[in-house]
From Swiss-Prot:
Organism (species): Pseudomonas fluorescens (strain ATCC BAA-477 / NRRL B-23932 / Pf-5)
The protein's role, per its UniProt record: Catalyzes the condensation of carbamoyl phosphate and aspartate to form carbamoyl aspartate and inorganic phosphate, the committed step in the de novo pyrimidine nucleotide biosynthesis pathway.
Molecular function as annotated in GO: amino acid binding; aspartate carbamoyltransferase activity
Pfam families: OTCace, OTCace_N
Annotated EC: 2.1.3.2
Pathway as given in its UniProt record: Pyrimidine metabolism; UMP biosynthesis via de novo pathway; (S)-dihydroorotate from bicarbonate: step 2/3
Protein name: Aspartate carbamoyltransferase catalytic subunit
Amino-acid positions noted as binding L-aspartate in the UniProt annotation, renumbered to this chain: 99, 184, 239
Domain of life per record: Bacteria
Family according to the record: Belongs to the aspartate/ornithine carbamoyltransferase superfamily. ATCase family.
NCBIfam families hit by this protein: asp_carb_tr (TIGR00670), PRK00856.1 (NF002032)
GO BP annotations listed: 'de novo' pyrimidine nucleobase biosynthetic process; 'de novo' UMP biosynthetic process; amino acid metabolic process
UniProt keyword Transferase present: yes
Matching PANTHER family: ASPARTATE CARBAMOYLTRANSFERASE, ORNITHINE CARBAMOYLTRANSFERASE, MITOCHONDRIAL
Length: 334
């Protein structure tokens, strides 16, 4: 267990409800299932003529992204708007943070504007935990991705994708392929799959892109694509994160594709009804062949759709948990 994992009680209020969403570590199957069930119920909102429910009316959600993002930032904005929240998205490149203002000073200024929730993406592992410890406890913190550590909403939208296409987790074989070492998505997915009862979790990567101690996640490790993909139900491809790499981990992107790229021929070794997933952005011809990314096995665009519903679920549940905690503290202070 890492020091980051030891901080997991921060996420829950005294009634065991979600109040922050920082990591999937330490959250039990019942809570993860509640998130999935709540997200399922929100999917129909996207099909309405008026795509709104009033659950966060009068609340303010601030998106504070210190790393670039398209899908995550946009889907969080849409999720908050569909819950009727007021939404502020901070452009860090043009904010005072670019002039040397610290992370906490930036957030405390937003807190002083009566924000109710921060969605934070940051390049440092543990940033979301740090913020949850040091801002006003009445502000809910949602981790939009922190360094290599965690991307919990991506993990949950991947779980919703799998559940909706496969019905459950108890009899599945799932392969996670690519840059495991630098991937917060891989870590969140491994934790979620284990918690939800998936019996066969595989990781496939070159040895240089496997983290030390990965066996603690209860996964089977493969360094050969043909062997690792044999009879799997789900293939989750990961982007090569060159921006987090130091030299020498890979000879070239072409060599990686030759050995670990998902091609139609390699996918034939999986089950005939296998699904292919990718958190995006996709590097075609590096980790995945276009014919696979756009083919009948791909559910990549479904992931984006499900991501809005999952983020609606997390925002609404965390806000509800914060409200319940304030009421609990007020009652016990009397």
């Amino acid at each position: 267990m890492t020091p980051l994992d030891a901080k997991r009680p921060l996420q829950l209020n005294d009634q065991g409800q979600l109040r922050h969403f920082l990591s999937l570590d330490g959250l039990n199957r019942e809570l993860l299932t509640e998130i999935l069930d709540t997200a399922d119920s929100f999917l129909e909102v996207g099909a309405r003529a008026v795509k709104k429910v009033p659950l966060l009316r009068g609340k303010t959600v601030c998106n504070v992204f210190f790393e670039n993002s398209t899908r995550t930032r946009t889907t969080f904005e849409l999720a908050a708007q569909r819950l009727s929240a007021d939404v502020i998205t901070l452009n860090v490149s043009t904010s005072s943070a670019s002039k040397g203002e610290t992370l906490l000073d930036t957030l405390r200024n937003l807190e002083a504007m009566a924000a109710d929730m921060f969605v934070v993406r940051h390049g440092d592992s543990g940033a979301a935990h740090f913020i949850a410890e040091h801002v006003c406890p009445q502000v809910a913190i949602i981790n939009g991705g922190d360094g290599r550590h965690a991307h919990p909403t991506q993990g949950m939208l991947d779980m919703l994708t799998i559940r909706r296409h496969k019905g459950g987790f108890e009899n599945l074989s799932v392969a996670i392929v690519g840059d495991i070492l630098h991937s917060r998505v891989a870590r969140s997915n491994m934790l979620a799959l284990k918690t939800l009862g998936c019996p066969d979790i595989r990781v496939i990567a070159p040895k240089t892109l496997l983290p030390i101690g990965i066996e603690q996640y209860g996964v089977k490790v493969y360094t050969d694509m043909t062997e690792g993909l044999k009879d799997v139900d789900v293939v989750i491809m990961l982007r090569l994160q060159r921006e987090r790499m130091q030299g020498g981990l890979l000879p070239s992107e072409g060599e990686f594709y030759r050995l670990f790229g998902l091609t139609t021929a390699r996918l034939a070794g999986a089950k005939p009804d296998a699904i292919v997933m990718h958190p995006g952005p996709i590097n075609r011809g590096v980790e995945i062949e276009s014919a696979v990314a756009d083919g009948p096995h791909s559910v990549i665009l479904n992931q984006v759709t499900y991501g809005i519903a999952v983020r609606m679920a997390v925002l609404s549940m965390a806000m509800s948990g914060q409200t319940a905690q304030r009421q609990f503290e007020q009652e016990n202070a009397q």
